[in-house]
A protein has these predicted regions:
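Acidic, glycine-anchored loop motifs typical of Ca2+
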Residues: 448-455, 459
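Short Trp-Ser/Thr-centered turn/loop motifs at beta-strand boundaries
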Residues: 175-180, 301-310
Length: 763
């Protein structure tokens, strides 16, 4: 049976399932959660039901299609139909089975709570990931992104308020059931939001929050708790992540206070919105200075997720995030005792590619225009018209017979794939800035990485891993590449990490070196070399000398990329370019709008600090960066400024200009933070820019505060950073941490091929 027959049979087949085979479809409630004395949430995962219904209707057809697929594969033929067959049939079943089910969930008559109908009900489909494949040998979860898997969050208003010790049984009309027993000391309340990792014992502000928004309902009403007591109690861990209890007498008692009504959180910018939809209450325990593992406990609501209060505060989160960098390492074996997520070395073979690096957004933006729209630089077609194209078009035209680059491996894999690129220098700037500003916080052996024990602080070893991949690309003339990429994003059509990650790897190619990438390398290598001097003088000299050579090559305007021509043979992403020859030119003059201008100036400053060679100071002064910084600061990582503000030697007026600009930005963030109910670190609510919060931008604001604190030691910046960390670690509307592996509730589904392919639910 082929797909054109499906539509006519859907209703008949579905009637057969719902009448004659209903008992074969599994139905359950995965969890019942407390939100308030009056509201609970029944969590339904309909995945098994949808797949069972799909099998009942289309099992024979899918088996036939799969056999045809396997036969064609064995015969060396292409067969695209099987994937479309599964996609179509699954989507049909999601609509035919799940949509009516979802509608039923939204009816009070469908549910019974302790035998009575709930007072109200509302449902939210919470996206989880994708539906699994047909069987263990089939296409894995990461290749079924068309099949959205959801959890139906069924919010039920109880007929009467919960009492301590009361059991609640939830039943659906189709037989699904779940239950809980509410206990003040041990039942988690999902409306209490805390930093689920650790608060610093000396933090000026330590707070938890209370609030919840429900679809179709709005802000849950916690007014009855305003002015009531909350208790900070020792926490005793249970057998599971969601088990445990508050024990003993309170170590701190405080009052629940209203922080912001939802009506005070409307913003008019960007179409208008409400920031949380919640009436947010605050529980301040800043005066508590003890250490240990605790939870917030509120009579009538339950307890929060556990957290620690420790002297080092955010040290545990720092360790976990740094371990994430280690796990992202490319070109090396990952093994115990450094990680439980083991794998052999990967991507150890790199060849010289014939493609332009992405150092100036060449592939996506129109750069400068010449007369009559004839582009003076960038990519141009045969007529001279400026064009944009996919980077994979040029990378795919790199020859597999290109020269090998022995030993070129390393760096960190990008977010979901395996490239290493110039943007990764941002990580290096952050690591070096932290090590420069707060050296007492970092030592050898604290991160449990292979380099631990070599006498060098681990944070510098990790930074060196990011620098070394580019150092290995350095040519004899000093030029350095800044991008290593494959001809396309890696596939994930295998069902295991070994196959998708290690077997049949596409060839890695390194981009043509350019001036901007070489300047960026010179900045990083000279900075790293200087910080390594107390621990390894020889390595220090090696990095600094390598930086000198890269800088000297990049400074020569004759090394600008000019007159490059690229015959396009493979052009799957840009079919109109196939068979043509495109041209590329780079302007040798660097202006304020060029990333190379910034990279050159900061490289000169760092080389001056590392060598005390006055020629680099002259280059810094000639760049005019001290005067232009405030105009282009929005495009410069504040971390890059750390050495310039903490080391002597630059013109005082330049340093003062940069310092003033950064302090003004930091003060603005401190001022706007208190305008948010959960003390999020962002621009002021009336400024908007909420659309730009994706891709980690909301995290990056903390860099400004870190530099301001390092330079001034004003505790207000430290407090603002701690508030921001609390937000990321669970003090937010969703009540989840934003970092895998930290806290009780954290992301497990993310765009990360390793995790999607290794068969382990926890990333």
């Amino acid at each position: 049976m082929r797909s054109h027959t499906l539509t006519s049979l859907v209703l008949l087949a579905h009637a057969m399932v719902t009448s004659g085979q209903q008992e074969a479809i599994p139905r359950s409630i995965k969890d019942v959660r407390v939100l308030s004395p009056d509201w609970i949430c029944a969590v339904v995962d309909p995945t098994e039901e949808i797949l069972a219904a799909r099998q009942a209707q289309f099992g024979l057809d899918l088996a036939e299609d799969k056999k045809s697929f396997e036969d064609d594969q064995a015969a060396g033929k292409s067969n695209w139909y099987y994937a479309f067959s599964k996609t179509y049939r699954t989507l049909v079943e999601q609509k035919a089975y799940h949509q009516p089910l979802f509608a039923k969930f939204n009816e009070t008559e469908f549910w019974k709570v302790n035998g009575a109908s709930p007072a109200d009900v509302t449902v939210w489909a919470h996206a989880l990931d994708s539906l699994p494949g047909m069987d263990a040998g089939d296409i894995p979860t990461c290749d079924t992104s068309n099949f959205f898997r959801t959890a139906d969050m069924v919010y039920l208003k109880l007929p009467g308020s919960l009492k301590d010790g009361e059991s609640v049984e939830v039943k659906g009309a189709d037989g699904r059931a779940g239950s809980l027993t509410f206990q003040d000391e041990s039942t988690p309340c999902w409306s209490i939001k805390v930093n689920q990792s650790a608060y610093a014992s000396d933090a000026k502000k330590k707070a938890a929050y209370l609030g919840m928004w429900l679809p179709g309902i709005g802000a849950l009403d916690f007014k009855a708790f305003e002015g009531k007591s909350f208790y900070l109690k020792k926490f005793e861990k249970g057998a599971r992540w969601d088990k445990g209890t508050a024990v003993g007498e309170p170590v701190f008692t405080g009052q629940i206070k209203l922080r912001k009504k939802f009506t005070d959180q409307d913003v008019k910018r960007e179409g208008g919105s409400n920031l949380t939809g919640e009436d947010v209450y605050e529980m301040d325990f800043s005066a508590f200075q003890g250490e240990g593992t605790y939870c917030i406990q509120i009579p009538g609501l339950g307890r929060s997720w556990p957290f620690q209060v420790t002297k080092d505060g955010y040290g545990s989160a720092f360790y976990t995030m740094m371990k994430g960098l280690y796990i992202q390492r490319c070109g090396t074996e990952l093994k115990k005792p450094f990680t439980a997520w083991e794998r052999p070395a990967c991507h150890t073979d790199t060849k010289q590619g014939q493609f332009i690096p992405e150092t100036n957004n060449w592939y996506t933006t129109k750069y400068r225009q010449g007369a009559e729209n004839q582009a003076s630089v960038g990519f141009r077609d045969a007529s001279g018209q400026r064009i944009g194209l996919s980077q994979f078009t040029l990378i795919g035209n790199s020859s597999p017979d290109s020269p090998a680059m022995p030993g070129v491996s390393g760096g960190w894999h990008d977010a979901a794939d395996f490239d290493r690129r110039i943007y990764h220098y941002g990580v290096i700037w952050d690591l070096l800035a932290a090590a420069e500003a707060f050296p007492a916080n970092f030592n050898d052996g604290q991160l449990n990485i292979p380099e631990s024990g070599n006498g060098i602080p681990d944070i510098l070893d990790e930074a060196a891993w990011g620098v070394d991949v580019w150092k290995k690309t350095q040519r004899s003339d000093g030029a350095v590449s800044s991008w290593i990429e494959q001809e396309s994003h890696p596939g994930s059509s295998a069902n295991s990490l070994a196959k998708s990650f290690l077997e049949n790897q596409m060839q890695m190619f390194a981009a043509t070196p350019d001036r901007t990438g070489s300047f960026a390398y010179a900045q990083a290598a000279s900075w790293l070399g200087r910080l390594l001097a107390p621990y390894s003088p020889e390595r220090s000299k090696e990095y600094i000398e390598s930086a000198r050579r890269a800088y000297a090559w990049a400074k020569d305007e004759d090394h600008a990329m000019k007159g490059r021509e690229f015959p396009i043979v493979n052009a799957m992403r840009d079919p109109k370019l196939k068979g043509t020859t495109i041209r590329f030119d780079e302007d040798p003059k660097l202006t304020e709008q060029d990333p190379g201008y910034v990279a050159a100036a900061f490289a000169a400053a760092n080389l001056y600090f590392a060598t005390k060679d006055g020629s680099y100071l002259q280059d810094w002064e000639a760049s005019g960066m001290g005067k232009t910084y405030s105009h282009i600061a929005h495009g410069i990582s504040p971390s890059m400024c750390m050495p310039l503000l903490l080391n002597e030697g630059l013109p005082p007026e330049d340093v003062e200009t940069m310092k003033k600009s950064l302090i003004e930005a930091a003060d603005k963030l401190v001022g706007s933070q208190d305008g948010y109910a959960y003390r999020m670190l962002w621009l002021a609510p009336d400024e908007g820019w909420f659309h730009a919060m994706g891709w980690g931008n909301v995290y990056s604001k903390a860099r400004t505060l870190a530099v301001a604190y390092a330079v001034t030691k004003d505790p207000k910046y430290k407090t603002a950073m701690e508030n921001a960390a609390d937000f990321f670690l669970g003090c937010n509307p969703t009540g989840t941490t934003t970092i895998t592996g930290i806290g009780s509730v954290y992301p497990v589904v993310l765009q990360h091929i390793h995790s999607m392919s290794d068969g382990i639910p926890d990333p």
